Every structure is written in structure tokens, then in C-alpha cells.
């Protein structure tokens, strides 16, 4: 088995999907989890205005709507959380995503004050954060807020990780990578677009250039610039297609060096890091 085949198998990626079937699969997955653990009353998700959180948010709300109708349990809710750092450049996209999702509840937590306070505390301890590390601080502060909300609403935190993100480890460890349940896991980027199109999402929300937008020195830096490959390259690779050798090497290097992000904390029983 080639490394490409191993990666595809590990991430559960498929070369082709039926959008309607995958929508139903994700909704049923969320519903089944909530029904298995009836003490869970809410799904909590940060909404950025990008493709992934828009899709995950819509699926969460659909799952909650169906469960409420089927069970009569009106205590179930989907909580969409806006988590700007100061003023967000694409705020209108966030509002458009909220309008599309129609969440039960919307909360806004501006993380700038908390990030700056943490940065100052570290500075006083003799640690000056780089812009890159400050970006990770933002991602972790966002996740901290979501877990606080989930803790107070008997909820679980929903993630947006998918195959095209997992393969490169393009997420912050214990930031946006630290979630309870991931309904998009298995899909690549273009497949996520197919689901949103089938759901009637406004096109500008999934045709915009994806960006983590964590660095102050490089605001709205496109993911594809940071990664050195395009999402079309990544999707082709995940679909088992032949890609240029340099593209495959770049993708595989990302995968191998970020393996620790896709695993629990390393123990004495692990040996993947020795290979």
C-alpha cells in the first residue's frame, strides 16, 4: 500500500460522494450521539463565516431541529458562537452564515481582551510572544470560550475538521483541533462545497479563499499560501488521483510532520514518532 493509499484510508476519504447521502449521514451521526447521551442538551460551534463552520453549523441546526420534532424535547439547542478578535474584516460573511444557519441561539464573545491579557501576563514572566504563537493563542482562546459555554449549557463542542484539513494538520493543537465531535471528518474541501450547494447556501460563503486569519503581520493569509499547495491539489490527492511529484511530496511532508496533532498525547506505548 502506498503512502497515499494509507493516508486516504486513515482519513476515511472517498473519491466521489452523493451530497444528499453525506448530509443525511452527518445529521444522523449527530442525532445518534445526542440520543446515546441524553444528558447532552446543546451543540456549541464557533462560526467564522467560512465554508467549514457554515457547513457544520447548518448540519448541527438540522440535527437539533429533527431531534426536537421527533422527541418533543424542547431543551435541545444549537448555540452558534461568534468569536471575533476586535473587529473581524469579513464580519458580513459571518452575519450571512448566521442567516443561512438560523441557529437557536447566537452568542458573541470578543476574545481580544483575553488574548492581550494573557500576552501581558507572559510578557511579565519574561516570555514575548511571536506573531505566529499569538495566532495560536487566539485559536485556543476561542476554544476555551466554547468549552465554557458548553459547560454551562450541558453541551458538547463541535469541530470543523475534515480530510483536507486533517491531512496537513492545518489547525491549532488544543485550539480549533480540540473538539468533542467532528461531523465533517471524511470530506475533502470540494465535497464540503457540494454539501453546501445542495443545502442552498449562498455561494460567496464557500467560494471565498479559505483563511485561518490568525496572524496580525499577515492578515487574512490564504490557507493555500501558508500550505504551499492548493486545496484542489489536496482534494485530488485524497481522491486517489495522480498529482505532480512535488505536490505529493509537500502534502505527505505535512501529513508526516503533523501526525502528533491527529493523536492523543504521546505515551510510552507509541512508536509512530520513531518511524
Swiss-Prot record:
Gene3D superfamilies: HUPs
CDD domains: NAD_synthase (cd00553)
Catalytic activity: deamido-NAD(+) + NH4(+) + ATP = AMP + diphosphate + NAD(+) + H(+)
Pathway: Cofactor biosynthesis; NAD(+) biosynthesis; NAD(+) from deamido-NAD(+) (ammonia route): step 1/1
Function: Catalyzes the ATP-dependent amidation of deamido-NAD to form NAD. Uses ammonia as a nitrogen source.
GO cellular component annotations of the record: cytoplasm
Binding site for deamido-NAD(+): 140, 173, 180, 260-261
EC number: 6.3.1.5
Protein name per UniProt: NH(3)-dependent NAD(+) synthetase
Amino acid at each position: 500500500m502506498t503512502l497515499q493509499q494509507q493516508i486516504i484510508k486513515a482519513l476515511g476519504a472517498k473519491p466521489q460522494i452523493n451530497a444528499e447521502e453525506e448530509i443525511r449521514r452527518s445529521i444522523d451521526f449527530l442525532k445518534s450521539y445526542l440520543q446515546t447521551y441524553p444528558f447532552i442538551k446543546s451543540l456549541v460551534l464557533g462560526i467564522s463565516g467560512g465554508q467549514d463552520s457554515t457547513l457544520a453549523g447548518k448540519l448541527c441546526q438540522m440535527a437539533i431541529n429533527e431531534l426536537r420534532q421527533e422527541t418533543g424535547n424542547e431543551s435541545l439547542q444549537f448555540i452558534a458562537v461568534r468569536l471575533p478578535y476586535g473587529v473581524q474584516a469579513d464580519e458580513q460573511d459571518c452575519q450571512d452564515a448566521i442567516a443561512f444557519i438560523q441557529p437557536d441561539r447566537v452568542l458573541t464573545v470578543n476574545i481580544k481582551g483575553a488574548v492581550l491579557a494573557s500576552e501581558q501576563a507572559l510578557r511579565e514572566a519574561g516570555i514575548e510572544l511571536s506573531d505566529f504563537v499569538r495566532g495560536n493563542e487566539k485559536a485556543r482562546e476561542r476554544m476555551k470560550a466554547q468549552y465554557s459555554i458548553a459547560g454551562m449549557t450541558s453541551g458538547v463542542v463541535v469541530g470543523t475538521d475534515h480530510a483536507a484539513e486533517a491531512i496537513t494538520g492545518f489547525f491549532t493543537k488544543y485550539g480549533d483541533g480540540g473538539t468533542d465531535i467532528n461531523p465533517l471528518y471524511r470530506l475533502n474541501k470540494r465535497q464540503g462545497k457540494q454539501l453546501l450547494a445542495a443545502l442552498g447556501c449562498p455561494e460567496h460563503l464557500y467560494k471565498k479563499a479559505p483563511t485561518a486569519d490568525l496572524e496580525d503581520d499577515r492578515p487574512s493569509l490564504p490557507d493555500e499560501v501558508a500550505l504551499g499547495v492548493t486545496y484542489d491539489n489536496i482534494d485530488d490527492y485524497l481522491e486517489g488521483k495522480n498529482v505532480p511529484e512535488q505536490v505529493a511530496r509537500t502534502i505527505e511532508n505535512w501529513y508526516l510532520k503533523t501526525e502528533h496533532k491527529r493523536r492523543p498525547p504521546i505515551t510510552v506505548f507509541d512508536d509512530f514518532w520513531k518511524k
